[in-house]
Structures are given as C-alpha cells and as structure tokens.
C-alpha cells in the first residue's frame, strides 16, 4: 500500500504539536509546506496555511482531551485518503458525495473502524475545503465562528463514535 497517507499523518501530527508549543504563525505556516506529495501545490489539493493551522490546533486539542490514540487517526486518514484523492470525483457534487460515503461507512463499519479518529479525519478534510473558494458548495464563515463550530462538532462526534 502507498505510504503517502502515513507520511502525511506524521507531518500533520508534527505540525499540530508545534502549534501547541506556541510557535509564531509564520513558523507554523512554514511547517505547512509538508514534504508530502499530497500537498503538491496543485490548485485542487491546495491547503490554505492559516486554515490548516486552525484545523490542526483544534483537532489536536480534541484528540488530547478525548484520549484518542494516534493509530485511530492514522487508520482514518488512510481511509479518507482513498475516498477523496482517487481523482475520479465530480467536483460539483464532491462535498455531498463524500458525506454520503462517510455516512455509509460509519453505518456499516466495525466499531474499531468507526472510531472517533475516522470522524476527525473526515471533518478535517471537509471543513478545510470550506475555505477554498474555488470549489462549489461551500459557504464562507468567519474564522472565529468556524473554529467554534468545528470544536463543537468534533467533540460531539468523538462522543458518538469513540
């Protein structure tokens, strides 16, 4: 199996850890230039640095609060990676299609597969794209409102699937 998702997860974990250590946003933004082919600068896969920082900070905080093992997050990211980055998606319906796939997977998966880490990985990618104005189907909201909503949703999801 391609090790790319595992490499990405390690980069994400390192990125979140630095953010929690109080580094400057410039330093954090520089870390967002992951040494990972997924983030290759193509418009479709572009990560906004500020958005990545906010997502990772909130996700990492929720994981620590809920005692989610990194193995669950890693397995979840691998699954989401296979769903999203196969290059066959209709970008006009990508958001709703992925939500349906995640719902179906959670309904049919085992307890281990549907752990909180899966929900975190899915929400990370879905919410990250909400800041990308080049993709259809997303509303723009303020950063403060976004962080508040993301933290609430992640916490609720963790309680449901852990």
Per-region residue spans from a language model:
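Extended, well-ordered alpha-helical scaffold segments
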Residues: 8-13, 72-84
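An acidic intrinsically disordered interaction segment
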Residues: 2-30, 93
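N-terminal interaction modules that seed assembly of large macromolecular complexes
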Residues: 22-68
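Helix-driven interaction modules
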Residues: 83-162
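Eukaryote-specific, cytoplasm-facing alpha-helical/coiled-coil scaffolding segments in long proteins
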Residues: 38-42, 76-89
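Short, solvent-exposed secondary-structure capping/transition elements
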Residues: 60-75, 86-90
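Residues within HEAT/ARM-like alpha-solenoid scaffolds
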Residues: 46-50, 72-75, 89-97
